[in-house]
Amino acid sequence: QSPKDAYPYDISELVKDAYPYDISELVK
């Protein structure tokens, strides 16, 4: 089973849902 099967949505979209701010800004 590929990760895409387990997570059919885009992981980046999931991150945006969890962290509505830009991750690059968080890293700064």
Curated annotation (Swiss-Prot):
Its EC number is 3.1.-.-. One of its GO terms (molecular function) is hydrolase activity. It comes from the Eukaryota. It is an enzyme of class 3 (hydrolase). Keywords: Hydrolase. The keyword Hydrolase applies. Belongs to the 'GDSL' lipolytic enzyme family. This is Putative GDSL-motif lipase/hydrolase-like protein.
